[in-house]
From Swiss-Prot:
Keywords: ATP-binding, Cytoplasm, Glycolysis, Kinase, Nucleotide-binding, Transferase. The keyword Nucleotide-binding applies. Monomer. It comes from the Bacteria. The lineage of its organism: Bacteria, Pseudomonadati, Campylobacterota, Epsilonproteobacteria, Campylobacterales. This is Phosphoglycerate kinase. Pathway: Carbohydrate degradation; glycolysis; pyruvate from D-glyceraldehyde 3-phosphate: step 2/5. It is an enzyme of class 2 (transferase).
Length: 401
């Protein structure tokens, strides 16, 4: 794991290349959440791309083409058009941005624009070849630039034309400032951390975190497991979890991880009590019970107050904290307390805290602690793969120092 992170840290960034007079193509991640009226509910990913775009403007780039996806469209769809983010992007950049609907139109537009112009290409996933890493599309994208910059950490685990294929044909290919910040922040937590190191892991499925748990035992000193995935671990201890979400085929795997952690001297903490209910959406009854005493026909939906107290003590004892996955169904107010209270505890420590993207970042934001964490990643799946010890495909094709 550490070797892979160190290798990714050696990637050249835009600070290592001459940009003046060059045509630049930046793969950004503008995949932001929007409501039914296309109002952006969280513009973090757009904000995080601004420093790289401004660096190119300030250093005299001839033209700047921005490429991103939005959602998972099946062909062209107005619902997933990047037109919806254009005004927010212009406001954050404090300059006008030219929107181009087709790849073919970019070259002709570029020929007529003044120096330092910024162009936003329509959703790259509208093009069939994007997710197939199509060679022709990759070459077409590369033809638009002298320098290819990947700044889309949230998509850096994908082998797509705009994140992977294009780099093979671009004359120069480097990391943007966000991509560099992401890898350096994870390196601080994983490759050269202050100890003790704690992993807080949650979410609904053990299956999505098995590789992470197996590989990170050599890096961390303690692990707190919450969320529905803790049910599978509790069942491996012989607890009857009633209607709680349990991945029965993975109960032996959970027991194996507990045994392996013990061998390596890594202390694992599981919930000692849970908030359980008869129904998550329309609960008639909500109870706090010991983890081993979930009532018949009930299911665990959050960690209980004794677990919050226990986990809080563990958190306060650590110098580095990595958090991936919520402690309960935090989107529902009745079952959000465990996640939110742990967020407050982490925020109150002096520890270096790294928050995995996706649900974890959303939960921390809802808890009002987003600005009190050392670093919050913009990538959900990408941060998980990084924690699993993988070298992300986007880094494989960028130049090294």
């Amino acid at each position: 794991m550490v070797a892979g992170i160190n290798l990714m840290q050696e990637t050249k960034s835009i600070r290592d290349v001459e940009i003046e007079g060059k045509r630049v193509l930046i793969r950004v991640d503008f995949n932001v959440p929007m409501d039914s009226d296309f109002n952006i509910s969280d513009d973090t990913r757009i904000r995080e791309a601004i420093p790289t775009i401004n660096h190119c403007i300030d250093n005299g780039a001839k033209s700047i083409v921005l490429v991103s996806h939005l959602g998972r469209p099946r062909g062209k769809s107005s619902e997933f058009s990047l037109k919806h983010i254009l005004k927010r992007l212009e406001r954050l950049l404090n300059r006008s941005v030219i929107f181009v609907e087709s790849l073919e139109g970019v070259s002709s537009v570029m020929a007529t624009l003044p120096q330092k112009s910024v162009i936003l290409l329509e959703n790259i996933r509208f093009l069939e070849g994007e997710e197939k890493n199509d060679e022709k599309l990759s070459k077409n994208l590369a033809s638009l630039c002298d320098i290819y910059i990947n700044d889309a950490f949230g998509a850096s685990h994908r082998k797509h034309a705009s994140t992977y294929g294009v780099a093979k044909f671009a004359p120069v290919k480097v990391a943007g400032l966000l991509l560099k910040k992401e890898i350096d922040s994870f390196a601080k937590a994983l490759a050269s951390p202050l100890k003790p190191v704690l992993l807080i892991v949650g979410g609904s499925k053990v299956s999505s975190k098995i590789t992470l748990l197996s590989n990170i035992l050599d890096v961390v000193d303690k692990i707190v497991i919450g969320g529905a995935m803790s049910n599978t671990f509790l069942k491996s201890l012989g607890y009857d979890m009633q209607r709680s979400l349990v991945e029965d085929p993975l109960v032996p795997e959970a027991a194996k991880i507990l045994g392996l952690a013990k061998q390596k001297g890594v202390k694992i903490y599981l919930p000692v009590d849970v908030v359980c209910t008869d129904d998550i959406k329309n609960p008639k009854e909500i109870k706090i019970t010991p983890a081993q005493d979930v009532p018949e026909n009930f299911l665990a939906a959050d960690i209980g107050p004794a677990s919050v107290k226990l986990f809080g003590e563990v958190i306060r004892d650590c110098e580095t904290i990595i958090w991936n996955g919520p402690m309960g169904v935090y989107e529902v107010q009745n079952f959000s307390r465990g996640t939110f209270q742990l967020a407050h505890v982490v925020a109150d420590t002096y520890a270096y805290s790294v928050i995995g993207g996706g649900d974890t970042a959303d939960a921390i934001d809802r808890a009002g602690e987003k600005d009190n964490m050392s670093f919050t990643s913009t990538g959900g799946g990408a941060s998980l793969e990084l924690l699993e010890g993988k070298i992300l495909p986007a880094f494989e094709v960028l130049e090294r120092k």
